[in-house]
């Protein structure tokens, strides 16, 4: 999936993936897509809930070995 920006949050523990995601989203325009790479298993639930509560769309989420990838479209 095409993204406008990629955020490398691998190796970061909760809550840092969310903190970095929020900061990166603030730099995007509405409709743009942020691709997030994380290794913290808690990021799956955290990013799903954060996306919904923030009015963003979690377009896709995949597990590639130890790396979780998320594509979030800014609302």
Curated annotation (Swiss-Prot):
What the entry lists under SUPFAM superfamilies is as follows: SirA-like (SSF64307)
Cysteine-cysteine disulfides = none
What Gene3D superfamilies does this protein map onto?
TusA-like domain
Source organism, top-level taxon: Bacteria
Where are the catalytic residues? 14
Q: Which PANTHER family match?
A: SULFUR CARRIER PROTEIN YEDF-RELATED
Q: Which family does it belong to?
A: Belongs to the sulfur carrier protein TusA family.
This one is known as Putative sulfur carrier protein YrkI
Organism equals Bacillus subtilis (strain 168)
The organism's lineage is: Bacteria, Bacillati, Bacillota, Bacilli, Bacillales
């Amino acid at each position: 999936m095409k993204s406008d920006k990629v955020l490398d949050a691998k190796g970061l523990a909760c809550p840092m993936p969310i903190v970095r995601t929020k900061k990166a989203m603030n730099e995007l325009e509405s409709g743009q897509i942020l691709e997030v790479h994380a290794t913290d298993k808690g990021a799956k639930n955290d990013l799903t809930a954060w996306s919904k509560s923030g009015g963003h769309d979690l377009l896709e989420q995949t597990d590639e070995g130890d790396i979780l990838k998320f594509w979030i479209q800014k609302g």
